[in-house]
């Protein structure tokens, strides 16, 4: 079950100071006496802290995330509706939900908040940070966190299906999805009541996202031009599939949260304010397993190849599957084999 801790204050990059900031989290395993065996799992856009649910194939004895050896931690990202500070949580200064007034978080704000949370849990250093998509963005930002003596706070990195910065291609996808939400009359500039949210807009945004998360061979191979029964109202099977996923998200997510998180993703750029992009990547010295997907059209393999080219201690592995971007949430056995083998060969030296 998810637990919650409170960070007393947090000042964001834009100067906003928040107080009594909740952070939801789950853990598996036991933190060692030196506080150095933590493995941080960073979740994706609409994910939550329940790693056992969406990455169960990687979690367990003998697997990539081994609670008999690791203190596995997943922290909910601010902006998400699953327990951390977000548009759906109460602003202690007003006694009302943040709603449309939720301040903009950057990926760096998230990492700074999560570091405070980890330190509250007694973590002194993280042995490995692993995550895909939005989670991979946070993994790369963790590379720049240092201890008081200047050593890396996170000793090894596993960014999956992500690049070192959000490109115009990815920003454009998010912008179009947000516009679908804004076009819903129930959006009301984000001030909608909790019992009457812009469900059509959010469902449409999810439908658009699902297309980008798959690949043409995946959708063509699964659905082709198959038709649905007339009474369904959607002529083609792929339409029914997209409507299904749109409606599922509406039942478990919030439109303001979706807007906040996609905007946070757009801030992702490891070189912002740090200098030349290639030089910044070359400064990341931690052992890194970069995982790409050969059918990913949203974060194409060329972006992981670029990361691996510049990260001085990187290993590149490729998941070959037709599913597209979401392969890292589908081909769990293959991903587990890659991560567990790499950790056994490389990361044992950093888990002291």
UniProtKB/Swiss-Prot annotation:
Coiled coil: none
Primary subcellular site in the record, as a coarse category: cytoplasm
HAMAP family: MetX_acyltransf
Family annotation (InterPro entries): AB_hydrolase_1 (IPR000073), AB_hydrolase_fold (IPR029058), HAT_MetX-like (IPR008220)
UniProt domain AB hydrolase-1: residue ranges: 37-330
Disulfide cross-links: none
The family this protein is said to belong to: Belongs to the AB hydrolase superfamily. MetX family.
Cellular compartments annotated: Cytoplasm
Source species, domain of life: Bacteria
Function: Transfers an acetyl group from acetyl-CoA to L-homoserine, forming acetyl-L-homoserine.
Sorted UniProt keywords: Acyltransferase, Amino-acid biosynthesis, Cytoplasm, Methionine biosynthesis, Transferase
GO terms classed as biological process: homoserine metabolic process; methionine biosynthetic process
Gene Ontology cellular component annotations, sorted alphabetically: cytoplasm
SUPFAM superfamilies xrefs: alpha/beta-Hydrolases (SSF53474)
Official protein name in the record: Homoserine O-acetyltransferase
Subunit structure: Homodimer.
Molecular function GO terms recorded: homoserine O-acetyltransferase activity
Gene: metXA
Enzyme Commission no: 2.3.1.31
NCBIfam families on file: homoserO_Ac_trn (TIGR01392), PRK00175.1 (NF001209)
